[in-house]
Amino acid sequence: MSGLKEKLVARALEEGFIACRICRPDAVPDVAARLKAFVDAGYHGQMTWMADRMHWRGDPTQLWPQARSVIMLAESYGPEHDPMAVLQQPERGAISVYAQGRDYHDVVKKRLKRLARWLMAEAADADPQVKVFVDTAPVPEKALGQAAGLGWQGKHTNLLSREWGNWAFLGAVFTTLDIAPDAAEVDHCGSCRACLDVCPTDAFPAPYKLDARRCISYLTIEHKGPVPTDLRPLLGNRIYGCDDCLAVCPWNKFATAARDMRLSARPELTAPRLADLAALDDAAFRALFSGSAVKRIGRNRFVRNVLYAIGNSGEASLRQIASELTDDPDDAVADAARWAVAQLGG
């Protein structure tokens, strides 16, 4: 298998990944303790699956004991527009950059599978086995990414790189092949606090620590039912996710736009009108977000978010739209509608 690693990296870049590095499955011994502290503090909120699968997420060797190497890959989704600009348009909704294109789970996983098939053929004499993962299994991708040398976990807890900033999806290929690991990356955040200071909800109790219960991405995507009243005004017009801590990172001066056009933003999702989104029924919601990660939260949670944004808009013209949803069959939607009407002076 002489030269396999070099061929693998070259093939990964040909497939469209922006970086490919290797680590051992046991290269993240501190993850279990950090995850336990996160869960013990209650920072995971309603994400009970984080606690339920902690034994796997905290120790990748438990996920697949036969694995000898983890191939970590990064795929760019850098925006071609300023993701913060829409925050100054209160009558429009802000959707996280990663969800403005096609669902990355589908795009990246297909690419990982192609790379895995190539690896199995290239190293056929060793009869390798492979498993691919993209954010849907209990894999500590960010920690493995740092161990493999892709980048480091910044103060906002996301992975970032001096080569491509922090606009990247991560994917992993576990394999029974023994491939020489790369050196781990070290922290390059220095004294910078940009990501911590920009957070609208003060979701970072300390650098490198996130309280998901206050994170807008968690509140608009993972949180079921009504959002706590004191946090609603802080959502602004963010209706699916939040990019503030990512967008202000100075290392993004090296970021590149998405190479795969499927991950590029759909124009109709960069700054959609709140009035149009509030009117979506289930069928219209599924049609608009077909192939998008947004579809995963369903119409009710999405319209709930839209109504919070309407309430924060200061636009009296949107009051009637909110009032029409005060009797919505979904309790969280109806509650959000009543709150929006009250915020707009109704």
From Swiss-Prot:
The keyword Cytoplasm applies. GO terms for biological process: queuosine biosynthetic process; tRNA modification. The keyword Plastid does not apply. Its EC number is 1.17.99.6. Binds 2 [4Fe-4S] clusters per monomer. It is found in: Cytoplasm. Its main location: cytoplasm. [4Fe-4S] cluster 2 binds at residues 199, 215, 242, 245. PROSITE patterns: 4FE4S_FER_1, 4FE4S_FER_2. GO terms for molecular function: 4 iron, 4 sulfur cluster binding; epoxyqueuosine reductase activity; metal ion binding. Keywords: 4Fe-4S, Cytoplasm, Iron, Iron-sulfur, Metal-binding, Oxidoreductase, Queuosine biosynthesis, tRNA processing. Pathway: tRNA modification; tRNA-queuosine biosynthesis. Coiled coil: none annotated. Residues 179-209 form the 4Fe-4S ferredoxin-type domain. Monomer. Catalyzes the conversion of epoxyqueuosine (oQ) to queuosine (Q), which is a hypermodified base found in the wobble positions of tRNA(Asp), tRNA(Asn), tRNA(His) and tRNA(Tyr). This is Epoxyqueuosine reductase. It comes from Roseobacter litoralis (strain ATCC 49566 / DSM 6996 / JCM 21268 / NBRC 15278 / OCh 149). The gene is queG.
